[in-house]
Amino acid sequence: MKLIRLLPILLVIGLSCLTSCQKEEIPSADNERTLFMYLPWSTNLTSYFYQNIEDMEDAISRRGLDKERVIVFLSTSSTEAELFEITVNNGICTRQILKEYTRPAFTTEEGLTGILNDMKSFASAKTYSLIVGCHGMGWLPVAQSKARAATKPRYHWEYSHTPLTRFFGGLTAEYQTEVTTLAKSLSNCGLKMEYILFDDCYMSSLEAAYDLRHVTRHLIACPTEIMVYGMPYSHIGE
């Protein structure tokens, strides 16, 4: 009889031990912030994007990551891209591939929404920030840039003895994304950025800011051209 009475007590104790063991095995992943570096295909900027990433890693290796994650979308060619995370351990940064893409439709609302959802699913956080690196067109729509292309303007790289910049307009329309497409894609994912930093030319127009007013709290951009090597990430990354 005494053994029978003890069985319920032993059962409760056993379940309590199992529950406590399960709780200890669950890692604490309290990610406060996710920074998303979005570097789509921009024809002649890829080598500079790699340098931008290395500069960001240089900053991360010095300061570390405190409840934050850094995710990068990089077009390695006009038809291929990869999503990876920058992690740091003992001052050494590594890149962990999260997903690879073939012909990503980053110029469409559906395609860009998918990329943003991938970032969100891999690195869910309380707050998000976005860095966009590519050529910039300001508020001009893609259709308008096609019309302008018919006039065969002379671009910055056609001039000799002048430093290259991230000139406005992009090189070809098939790789250009409307500002409104970015805004709709962020909204589709339920994202409101703490800030959007455009490492592109001419992106601080009132029209572009108005289109993005519901999807970011702050806009960091330039009203003029930006030099081709982009922002000094080894410094601002700290």
Task: Show the residue positions of the predicted features.
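C-terminal motif of bacterial Sec signal peptides marking the signal peptidase cleavage site
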Residues: 17-20
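Short, solvent-exposed loop/turn and secondary-structure capping segments
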Residues: 48-49, 82-84, 140-146, 208-209, ...
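Structural recognition of the beta-strand scaffold that forms the well-ordered cores
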Residues: 34-39, 69-74, 128-132, 194-198, ...
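N-terminal extension/subdomain marker
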Residues: 22-126
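A short, glycine/acidic-enriched catalytic loop
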Residues: 137-188
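Bacterial N-terminal signal peptides that target proteins for export
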Residues: 1-8
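Active-site-proximal C-terminal subdomain of hydrolase catalytic domains
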Residues: 191-238
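Solvent-exposed loop/turn segments at secondary-structure junctions
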Residues: 41-44, 76-80, 104, 134-140, ...
